[in-house]
Amino acid sequence: MTELARLKFYATQPHPCSYLPEEQATTLFLDPSQPMDTQLYASLSEVGFRRSGDHLYRPHCQHCTACIAARIPVADFSPNRQQRRILKRNAELQVIRKRPSFNEEYYDLYRRYIEQRHADGDMYPPSRDQFATFLVRDLPFCCFFEFRLHGRLLAIAVTDVLPNGLSAVYTFYDPDEEQRSLGRYAILWQIAETERLGLQAVYLGYWIKNCRKMNYKTQYRPIELFVNQRWVALT
């Protein structure tokens, strides 16, 4: 924490919250002039920071503490019955690690995902510029995990590979393959990959108790939440 105390951070002005419409949000950003090296990012992930594009951020709201960083300690994870079914259903998928890049195959999948799954969100309507700015970043720790079935692209898990674990940045998938539960499968695969790499945890971003879209995160047990400057197991 001593090194982190020397860093500069900037807070945004209050703005409408994307998850709790009745709330005003404030976000704390790492000084964008600070080089985002892998070790610094890992250290900040340990205190609840996330990456979006080229920025590291954390909620910094004055009157709300609903957004809580969440991670899965993979050594203790055991899939439940439903999760085992999802793993079996997708066992034939091939996963390929790629450097982040823009191509029409990726963008078409992203566009259809946003249009059919998140037309009510602040990422709608999708655009090529939005896709490139948000996800296609030339960072040494970032990769695209492609999930393919007989060559056909079904999903991409945008993932940061850090010394302390995998950070699940964003996953988008074929909305016509709903029966496969590809979003859940991507997390299960990231858990297995984290363990294979000998790393500690999968960082899932923020969990909000009263946000329906966030409920899926607590289906992975055990899960730890960053509360009062320390990680505690959710019971």
UniProtKB/Swiss-Prot annotation:
Location in or out of the cell: Cytoplasm
Catalytic activity, reaction form: N-terminal L-glutamyl-[protein] + L-leucyl-tRNA(Leu) = N-terminal L-leucyl-L-glutamyl-[protein] + tRNA(Leu) + H(+); N-terminal L-aspartyl-[protein] + L-leucyl-tRNA(Leu) = N-terminal L-leucyl-L-aspartyl-[protein] + tRNA(Leu) + H(+)
Main localization, broad class: cytoplasm
GO molecular function: arginyl-tRNA--protein transferase activity; leucyl-tRNA--protein transferase activity
GO cellular component term of the entry, any: cytoplasm
EC number(s) per entry: 2.3.2.29
GO biological process: proteasomal protein catabolic process; ubiquitin-dependent protein catabolic process via the N-end rule pathway
Keywords: Acyltransferase, Cytoplasm, Transferase
Pfam families: ATE_C (PF04377), ATE_N (PF04376)
Family that this chain belongs to: Belongs to the R-transferase family. Bpt subfamily.
Function of the molecule: Functions in the N-end rule pathway of protein degradation where it conjugates Leu from its aminoacyl-tRNA to the N-termini of proteins containing an N-terminal aspartate or glutamate.
Name of the protein this chain belongs to: Aspartate/glutamate leucyltransferase
Naturally occurring in which organism (per UniProt): Pseudomonas aeruginosa (strain ATCC 15692 / DSM 22644 / CIP 104116 / JCM 14847 / LMG 12228 / 1C / PRS 101 / PAO1)
